Amino acid sequence: MDFYYLPLSAPCRSVIMTAKALGIELNKKLLNLFEGEHLKPEFLKINPQHTIPTLVDNGFAMWESRAIMVYLVEKYGKQNDPLYPSCPKKRALINQRLYFDMGTLWKSYADYTYPQFRENKPADPELFKKFESALEFLNIFLSQSKYAAGQTMTLADLAILASVSTFDVVQMDLSKYEHILRWYNMLKDTAPGAAENWAGCLEMKKYFKK
């Protein structure tokens, strides 16, 4: 299956880690957004929203990283796969964490940092407070269980790991978040695809410094 991606993208990295966990080989197609490759007609035919990651599986195209992660487990995972178990309550908690990562954790990071390195704007203290608030919520979640959505690793961990490792590489101070650090230190080198995730983080760091 074809996978259109950019290594520095946290959402792309979360899909790569999911594929690794499932033993799926992705046909990776680098798409350089900085050179406008996502706006070429051939890619717009695949994804008119022109976003990454984008997956094409036997002619079926989809995007949005967390939707791709769920699709991969539902189609290629084991029955009642621990990454995304069939129990409605367990799935609901995983979904909650995935949506929290997308709509609160990663969004607050992006809202705070992107204007600084994309538009050279000064840091906004109010936006930083929102980012800290998101980290505090995550710290609470991780005080209640070993992993992000229970006692075993799930898709929620892979998505949030892609986010938190990005925070780490750009030197966001996580030292006061005891439970995030415990969880992060447990997974950062051992999660499926951890090495490729970190390599992508280092690419992100280069862009962040420009």
Swiss-Prot record:
The keyword Cytoplasm does not apply. It catalyses: RX + glutathione = an S-substituted glutathione + a halide anion + H(+). It is an enzyme of class 2 (transferase). One of its GO terms (molecular function) is glutathione transferase activity. Its EC number is 2.5.1.18. Pfam families: GST_C (PF00043), GST_N_3 (PF13417). Residues 87-208 form the GST C-terminal domain. It comes from the Eukaryota. CDD domains: GST_C_Delta_Epsilon, GST_N_Delta_Epsilon. Residues 1-80 form the GST N-terminal domain. Glutathione binds at S9, H50, T51, I52, E64, S65, R66. Keywords: Transferase. One of its GO terms (biological process) is glutathione metabolic process. Coiled coil: none annotated. Conjugation of reduced glutathione to a wide number of exogenous and endogenous hydrophobic electrophiles. Homodimer. Belongs to the GST superfamily. Theta family. PANTHER family: GLUTATHIONE S TRANSFERASE D10, ISOFORM A-RELATED. This is Glutathione S-transferase 3. It comes from Musca domestica (House fly).
